[in-house]
């Protein structure tokens, strides 16, 4: 006795569910069984049972019906509203026309880290950011920024340890990294607006924003004497705006007087008037220092306004708030108090949080980036110093091109 089994194409139609619309059932399988003559009726009976089980889907139960879509509730009449705010939001054209706050590449200052070497070094705690070689990498990055309308940059130096000292003399070396870089950029890009940092900590062996006395106290007046010389050196190199970022008393007035005395009346001062002691700073720094004796307590708002008022009286041209997103209330209060332009610094920690969450697919990085910048503008900032400057400006340029092509 011999038998063989082989598969043949199925001729049984597919089974569909309720009204044959949304549900597609299982497709039947079919087999042909060729049975030779058997001497045993019992074997033939078993094969018939096997054959009946191989085509079970044909007799399978239908799938349960798909639930119907809930009907819209019926109302007797619409609400009698004198105003429906949604009318002004019903189409893209109207939403764009009524938008109260706008942002453009002209609002951005692009912070750039530079060092003496030629190779661009990644900053591990800030995805996408680099310590740029001051001659090649920097020039290329500035050119990219200018291509998308970012015409302002701020320079931050990585000073070699061998050049640091307790009193920071390298800060006002006319042949130092910052003056050389400013001259190079002005030669290549004459219309570029260059902001420089009048800041002591990068040049100090202690890392503090001032000369540290024997008792551990920051020496206010002695440090300002050094900052004045630093500001003049930067102005001499061609800086357009010097930024007094150390929260030391009287620094703005002293720097203004020094600049004027040297004939740099047209060089502006952007004062970091409100610089909070924030945990969002300097994730690219190796050492975190306690700077609470000269930076502002994040719990205080009146103190922040007082500092800004004093800087304005001393001759500041722009008032800066740092960090940006945690200080939106301060930006608004300051906007209501002064007629001076206001800057906001979206610091490294703010940048890294958005970048990290974007890389982990927890948020839409681009949308959160643009929303954060728009909120800073809405609060009252005229300028935003942001590591997103190039990325955001590139997106804005793309949107403008799409709009003009339509």
UniProtKB/Swiss-Prot annotation:
Active site: which residues? 275, 322
Residues reported to bind 5-aminolevulinate 1: 285, 291
Q: Is Metal-binding a UniProt keyword of this protein?
A: yes
- Output the GO biological process annotations, alphabetical, semicolon-separated: chlorophyll biosynthetic process; protoporphyrinogen IX biosynthetic process
Q: Which amino acid positions bind Mg(2+), per UniProt? A: 307
Q: What is its EC number?
A: 4.2.1.24
| A GO MF label | metal ion binding
Q: Where does 5-aminolevulinate 2 bind?
A: 348, 387
Q: Does the keyword Plastid apply?
A: yes
Pathway terms, separated by semicolons? Porphyrin-containing compound metabolism; protoporphyrin-IX biosynthesis; coproporphyrinogen-III from 5-aminolevulinate: step 1/4; Porphyrin-containing compound metabolism; chlorophyll biosynthesis
Write out the catalysed reaction.
Answer: 2 5-aminolevulinate = porphobilinogen + 2 H2O + H(+)
Q: Which cofactor does it need?
A: Mg(2+)
Query: Where would you find this protein in the cell?
Result: Plastid, Chloroplast
What keywords does the record list, in alphabetical order?
Allosteric enzyme, Chlorophyll biosynthesis, Chloroplast, Heme biosynthesis, Lyase, Magnesium, Metal-binding, Plastid, Porphyrin biosynthesis, Transit peptide
What the entry lists under InterPro entries is as follows: ALAD, Aldolase_TIM
Q: How does it assemble?
A: Homooctamer.
Query: This protein is called what?
Result: Probable delta-aminolevulinic acid dehydratase 2, chloroplastic
Identify the species of origin.
Arabidopsis thaliana (Mouse-ear cress)
